[in-house]
Amino acid sequence: MNEQQLESIKRKNAWLHDLVEVEFPTKESLEGRAIYTRMLEEQSYQVVEKSLLLDKEQRLTAEDIFLVDFHRLTVMFSILQSQRWSDKHEQEMIVEYLTQIILSPEFELYVGFAEGEAVGAAIVSQY
């Protein structure tokens, strides 16, 4: 992984950390941030060639993937991300935390749907 990619990850993580840097954050959103931060500390990253992603049988088409640009999609994004945790309480705290997201052009959120169900979520940046 090159420096530019690592810097993009750092910027994304700083942006996510600052979501609850407000005057009166909720106890739940702060707990959600702590849970999310612990996960980041255990996270490892690897570069995946774009061609590897495109060569796989594609489950979603471009028409199935939506830019998160209003609150309901933010909630769906948060719920999908929370499913990375097995503990129900942690999932609830992650939803509370991530629904605080203030949309930014630097980090775009996407939600993918299959047969009317939200099945994928991503944070995308152009580094």
Model-identified regions with their sequence ranges:
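A conserved beta-turn-beta hairpin within the catalytic core of GNAT-like acetyltransferases
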Residues: 126-127
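Short amphipathic alpha-helix that is part of the acyltransferase structural core
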Residues: 12, 42-99
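Conserved beta-hairpin
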Residues: 106-122
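Short loop/turn motifs at secondary-structure junctions and domain boundaries
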Residues: 100-105
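Acyl-donor-binding surface of acyltransferase catalytic domains
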Residues: 1-64
